[in-house]
């Protein structure tokens, strides 16, 4: 739900507690302290923490996102939204992304505009990412910083050198003495640490002697991070979806106590699925469901309404479990 609505979260760590903060804009995110972080290569000895590796990439995006949905209450009047790319300079308008959103995807136009805006911001957030490696100890996801002394960004405006940290992976090893003969236990992180542990220049022999004597390790700290421009809206990628359509199911028609037939003004009915163990007898525990009829049209057609306790077959439009449709009735042991 958060991904669909454009919400994301970060964690604030303090000495006595950890707090999860939800937000929908990068403007509320705090900066690192200090805010400016220098870039320098690994072969340079520095007294201050800095970023040692940096890479960036981008993808070609569509120039606009076009959505369409239909609602049977407004027959013949499809609902549409057209959302232009926020990064219009690098997204040709001719490259349109068209998506059909199924039955009654939104009720009001501003709701459809917001949902489509969130999706196009998801694409743009993922399209331009930076990756790096550093020894900066205060690196933390949900914070932003300003890059300095990088040759590709030195002449750019301040906002083009400000980056939001999306993910930070930290590796740290102490310099405590280790046993000469040690065995890796199941689930050990030793293999992962070997893949990232730096080899200090000129100290290879010293480290080998230290390992042999068991007097200690040189220890290290580094992190890998992913980020984006702070000026670009961040949206979590769509990675969590509704459960898949389970296929056609049967259910029992339910009505309030004392009613053999019960519908709304559109002749829709309520049902109780066989797996529903919470709904009570006589309770309308489902939404109103439309039912397929032998014929239907303006001023002609026929309608048959199932009675309480009768069994019906239900399918789901566009594989959406929130869009059930009654296909017809079936006989069972209680109704020969």
Indicate where each model-derived feature is located:
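Amphipathic alpha-helical and helix-coil boundary elements used as assembly
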Residues: 2-336
């Amino acid at each position: 739900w958060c991904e669909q609505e454009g919400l994301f979260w970060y964690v604030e760590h303090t000495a006595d507690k950890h707090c999860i903060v939800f937000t929908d804009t990068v403007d509320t995110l705090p900066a690192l302290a200090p805010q400016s972080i220098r870039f320098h290569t690994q072969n340079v000895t520095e007294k201050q923490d800095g970023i040692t590796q940096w890479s960036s990439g981008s993808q070609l995006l569509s120039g606009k996102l076009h959505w369409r949905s239909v609602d049977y209450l407004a027959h013949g009047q499809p609902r549409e939204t057209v959302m232009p790319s926020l990064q219009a300079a690098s997204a040709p308008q001719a490259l349109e992304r068209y998506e059909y959103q199924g039955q009654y995807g939104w009720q009001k136009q501003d709701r459809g505009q917001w949902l489509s805006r969130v999706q196009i911001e998801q694409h743009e957030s993922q399209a331009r990412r930076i990756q790096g490696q550093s020894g900066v100890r205060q690196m933390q996801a949900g914070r932003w910083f300003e890059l300095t002394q990088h040759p590709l960004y030195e002449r750019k405006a301040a906002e083009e050198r400000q980056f939001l940290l999306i993910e930070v992976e930290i590796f740290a090893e102490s310099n405590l003495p280790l046993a000469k003969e040690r065995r890796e236990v199941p689930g050990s992180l030793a293999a992962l640490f070997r893949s990232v542990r730096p080899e200090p220049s000129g100290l290879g022999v010293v480290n080998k002697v230290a390992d042999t004597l068991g007097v200690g390790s040189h220890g290290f700290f580094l992190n890998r991070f992913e980020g984006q421009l702070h000026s670009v809206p961040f949206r979590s990628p769509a990675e969590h979806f509704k459960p898949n359509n389970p296929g056609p199911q049967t259910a029992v028609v339910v009505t309030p106590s004392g009613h053999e037939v019960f519908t709304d003004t559109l002749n829709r009915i309520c049902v109780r699925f066989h797996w529903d163990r919470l709904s009570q007898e006589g309770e309308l525990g489902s939404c109103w469901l439309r039912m397929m009829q032998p014929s239907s049209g303006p001023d002609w057609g026929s309608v048959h309404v199932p009675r309480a306790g009768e069994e019906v077959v239900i399918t789901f439009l566009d594989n959406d479990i929130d869009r059930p449709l009654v296909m017809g009735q079936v006989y069972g042991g209680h109704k020969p």
